[in-house]
Amino acid sequence: MAVAKSPFYIIRNFLSPKQCDVIIDKLRFYEPDVDTEGNPLKMIRHEDESETLIFSRFEPLIPQLEEYYDYSHLGTEKISFEYYPQGCETEPLCENSNWVNKKWVRTKNRDISCILFLSQYNENPDFETDFEIYGGLLGFHNFNFSFHPERGTLIVFPSGPHFINSTSPIKMGDLFQARFHLQGKLPYLYQPDKFPGADNPLRNWFQGLHD
């Protein structure tokens, strides 16, 4: 029997709660944009100081990711800092491809994607509105599971169509997260047989996490 290996590389405590709070303060999202019907919209910003902090922590990890994914790193995109206000709903997305003529077509030079949670999930009545969120789960449709936002945790995964993802509706609070992408020297092809355990990912893939 093959030893299970997760295609999700998870690093808890990548940033401290205090560092997450500082980034949220720097983003200066005050009032959400709305659509024509008054529904709040996801907003994106770039913030140079916060990007420098994240990349200073991330760059030493690149050799580990190269080995883990059997991938040769070429470069990293700018970080998009995302704000999902209460009531916001979004559509599923693929990080590097679009659905064209009934098939996925790669349209972006992205091979590995990263999402860093800056907010903390909480479904209990004792709720800290400054940094906690109810809703905002990061769902991966092909694997039928979701990650609860845990501030300071970094989720790394391949960018292709096997990893279509979405953020569930924000029921209470505001969700903040950072999203960025890595490009390889050659296009990365996700091969499921190199990541055994998809028959029961919650049991097989997440027994041990990276701190």
Predicted regions and their residues:
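Fe(II)/2-oxoglutarate oxygenase catalytic core
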Residues: M1-L154, H162-D211
